[in-house]
Amino acid sequence: MITLDLTLPDCRYPIHIGQGVLDRAGELVAPHLPQSRALIVTNDVVAPLYLERCRQSLQAAGVCTEVVILPDGEAHKDWQTLNCIFDALIAMRAERKTALVALGGGVIGDMTGFAAACWQRGAPFVQIPTTLLAQVDSSVGGKTAINHPAGKNMIGAFWQPRVVLADLDVLDTLPEREFSAGLAEVYKYGLIDNLPFFEWCEQQVPALLARDKAALAHAVEVSCRMKAAIVGQDEKEQGVRALLNLGHTFGHAIEAGLGFGVWLHGEAVAAGMVLAAETAQEMGQLESADVLRIRALLLQSNLPVVPPAWPLATWLELMGHDKKVEGGQLRFVLPDRLGHCRLESGVGEKYLEKVLIHNIRD
């Protein structure tokens, strides 16, 4: 097992990565809880696979647990489903020190964290991510939210977990499409600030797709280490943390425009990263050969590289709800070379139109 620490001015918490971590949930989680009571929040896909193992481990460590099982999918990341968590907390007479344990992917983690941030103005919570995307990205860093019909993650809070458990073994049951979606977020780290890691990913696609445990351990560790370092510098996304949104301005627009859940988050980010790279190319910041390498890596990993065919006005309306908008102006994370990105304001519509029309014609 590998243990990383994320250190912030007001808190510090461990990220445990390895095989068999879920069965050690009790010993790894209990020391971080202020009270020996917890609500496990999971979904109807994960529950039959991992709920009892998680619950038994926590109870063996003296943590009394209740459970709420939510419907699976991005389409349920809303107020109605969030209220199911609050109803369960009320039914169990939860207190401010009662912990919430997120057992699931990014949707479960985001909603559980937001519920914890809201419950009696702040309750402890734990992340036990069961998807690759959640293990390498959404479970680390304290971003919590639900969606609004107008946009992705529009309603939320920064609320850090007490501990994160990333069990590589649970990835064995992940559907291929969801596994590939997680790889998009892995590759993102190489693109924003780690060229050697990007090159390693290019070489390791077969091993990653085969879910080789050594390759997965390295991918998850590097991703979490990079995210922990960035969040440690900029918890509330006032500066460098914005770089983690590479591909997300386009990607969130795709998710909202198609309807949440039609494309997986990682699929939308993959297409968004290609659009960001092609925008940078049009602006003269990125070589065409680098764009081709990005596209090739994503295609090898069974990820989409062509966005929906929408008019520019539709894109601009959808992207106008992006959380990086400042002073009414869109801001994009764009690569200027492989392994390096920067935040750009004032990207001309002529570049966006050319890139989007180019993709539509493809």
UniProtKB/Swiss-Prot annotation:
Binds 1 divalent metal cation per subunit. Can use either Co(2+) or Zn(2+). Pathway: Metabolic intermediate biosynthesis; chorismate biosynthesis; chorismate from D-erythrose 4-phosphate and phosphoenolpyruvate: step 2/7. Belongs to the sugar phosphate cyclases superfamily. Dehydroquinate synthase family. Its cofactor is Co(2+); Zn(2+); NAD(+). It catalyses: 7-phospho-2-dehydro-3-deoxy-D-arabino-heptonate = 3-dehydroquinate + phosphate. Keywords: Amino-acid biosynthesis, Aromatic amino acid biosynthesis, Cobalt, Cytoplasm, Lyase, Metal-binding, NAD, Nucleotide-binding, Zinc. NAD(+) binds at residues 72-77, 106-110, 130-131, 143, 152. Zn(2+) binds at E185, H248, H265. It is found in: Cytoplasm. It comes from the Bacteria. SUPFAM superfamilies: Dehydroquinate synthase-like. Catalyzes the conversion of 3-deoxy-D-arabino-heptulosonate 7-phosphate (DAHP) to dehydroquinate (DHQ). Its EC number is 4.2.3.4. This is 3-dehydroquinate synthase. GO terms for cellular component: cytoplasm. It holds the Pfam family DHQ_synthase.
